[in-house]
Amino acid sequence: TLEEVMEVMISGEKQEKKVVRLHTGDPCLYGAIKEQMDLLEKENISYKVCPGVSSFCGAASALNAEYTLPGISQSVVITRMAGRTPVPEKESIESFAAHQATMVIFLSTGMLEELSKRLIEGGYQPETPAAIVYKATWEDEKVCRCKVKDLAVTAKENGITKTALIVVGEVLGGEYERSLLYHPEFTTEFRQGKGKEGAGNV
């Protein structure tokens, strides 16, 4: 519980020990750290939050994927299905799906039939590329590619019931546009572009 965690941290501080509260991934995502920081401040205990590597970054590596492909998506939505922790109505899966951006969905592996339904109702085509990444960056990591409509059956066939991320979007397909960043006609701070668009910038 929060109280038990705080008891250990406060006790360590009183004993002048170096206390590390270790989280998986990056604590800024679904880490419940705000309440811990508030209680530390109440006790006048200083702290430092160190960044980690979120599983959604690990999943991109496992997929050899770029979440922001030119001409496909320049945005990434990180969200979850409502469970024991509610999700505000304005942040529904359907409302995010309407943007057709890349979506990375946490904490929803046990609700994949409902997730597929909501993604499709929101605007994704049933055939939209998707992936289930189980235990990203772990030794027993597993990557299962599928379509949005097949999320539930794919998870069942591979024995995945928890500890997985769902990635959805056309960035998992094969189409994209060449980036401007490395285009010969594109000017940056370090390189003058060649051609009529040489003065262009992102």
Question: PLM features: what roles do these ranges have?
Answer:
Residues T1-C50:
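Class I S-adenosyl-L-methionine
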Residues E4, Q15-V19, A32, D38, ...:
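A contiguous loop/helix-start segment that scaffolds small-molecule binding in enzyme catalytic cores
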Residues V20-T24, Y47-G52, C57, L69, ...:
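General beta-strand structural signal in soluble alpha/beta enzymes
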Residues H23-T24, E43, T79-R80, T102-M103:
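Short, contiguous strand/loop micro-motifs
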Residues D26-Y30, V53-S55, G110-L112:
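Gly/Ser/Thr-rich loops at beta-strand to alpha-helix junctions
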Residues M37, E66-P70, T85:
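Proline/glycine-rich low-complexity loops and linkers
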Residues L39-A59, P70-T79:
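Short, acidic/small-residue loops that bind anionic groups at enzyme active sites
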Residues S61-T68, K90:
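Active-site-proximal loop->helix
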